[in-house]
Swiss-Prot record:
Residues 144-170 are annotated as: Disordered. This is Heat stress transcription factor A-3. Belongs to the HSF family. Class A subfamily. Pfam families: HSF_DNA-bind. It comes from Arabidopsis thaliana (Mouse-ear cress).
Amino acid sequence: MSPKKDAVSKPTPISVPVSRRSDIPGSLYVDTDMGFSGSPLPMPLDILQGNPIPPFLSKTFDLVDDPTLDPVISWGLTGASFVVWDPLEFARIILPRNFKHNNFSSFVRQLNTYGFRKIDTDKWEFANEAFLRGKKHLLKNIHRRRSPQSNQTCCSSTSQSQGSPTEVGGEIEKLRKERRALMEEMVELQQQSRGTARHVDTVNQRLKAAEQRQKQLLSFLAKLFQNRGFLERLKNFKGKEKGGALGLEKARKKFIKHHQQPQDSPTGGEVVKYEADDWERLLMYDEETENTKGLGGMTSSDPKGKNLMYPSEEEMSKPDYLMSFPSPEGLIKQEETTWSMGFDTTIPSFSNTDAWGNTMDYNDVSEFGFAAETTSDGLPDVCWEQFAAGITETGFNWPTGDDDDNTPMNDP
C-alpha cells in the first residue's frame, strides 16, 4: 500500500439514535424516544387562554385608539372613557366601514348591552371599568348582559329539572283544570255573542219595519193633502167643531147648575153621576119643572118653536098634533133636557185627530190587515162613518139642511 492512501482519513460516521425495545418482557410497545426529550414543549398563545374578546369591543378599542380619528372619536381626558365628538360623521363614515350599518342608536344600544354608561349629558361620553387606554387585555373582563327573559327561562328550567315527579304531576293537573275552565268560559262567551247577534238582527228588523210604516204614513198624508175635496171638507169640519165645542160646554154648565146640591148635603156640592135606576124620577121632576115654566112664561109668539116639546092641553087635543113630527128645533130642546136624565157627563170631543187619526195608506192594504172603500174625493168612507157614529152615540140629530141657524151652536 502506498503511504498516500493511508494518510487519507475516513469520515466519521453519524450516530443516529436507535429506538430501543421495551425492557418489559412480552411488551409490544417500542420506546420512541429519539433523543428530543431535553427540548422545551410549545406553549399556547395568550389570546387562547381565558375568555375571548368580543369583536365589537376590540373594534371599538381600535377606533378610539386610532389618532387619525381623534376629531370624530377619541379617549377622554383621564383615559378611562371615550368621547364621540361628531355622531353624524361617525354614523356616516366609520360605522358602515367597521360595523356594516350606519345607525348611531344601534351602536349606543350595543354599548349598553356590554355595560357601558353615559357619564356626561352634554356630550356622547361612555365609560366602563375594563375599557381603559393602553390596557386592551382587560377587554376580556367585559361580558355581555343577558336579557331578563333568558334568566327567567334558565331559572324555570332548573327548578323544573329539580322538581319531584309528584310536584310535576300536580302542576300538570292544575294546568289541565285551568285549560278546562278557560274552554268553558270561551263556550259561554260564544253563546252570549250569538245571542247578542240575534238580538241585534231583531232590532234591525223592527227598525226597518218602523221606517217602512213611517214612509207609508208620510206618503199617505202627502196624497191626502193634495186632494182639494178633502181639504174643503176638513175646513168645514173645523168650523163646525169650534161651534159644537161651544154648545157642548154650555150644555155641560147647564147640567152642572141644574143638578148642583146644597152645601149641607152629604156630597158637599159635588156633581153626582146618576145611574139608570134614577132616570124615571129625574125625568118626571124635569117635566114638571119645564111644564111649570112653559105655562107661566109662554107667549103667543114662538118664532123658534121651543113650545113643541111641552105643548099645552089645547094643542094636544087637536087631531093634527098627533099626525105632526117635531121640527129640528124641538129635537135640540129635547137634547138639552137629556142632560137631566142621568147620562154620563163625559162627552167625546170630535177633534180632527179623533176623526182622522185612524187614516191609513189604503193603497198598502196588506200592511194594516183590512181594506176600506174610498169616495170620489179620495177620503175613506170609514172616516165619515166613524164621525157619524160618534155623533149618534151622544144623541145629537144634526139637521141636513143648508140653514146653519138651526144648529145647536146658535141656540141661546
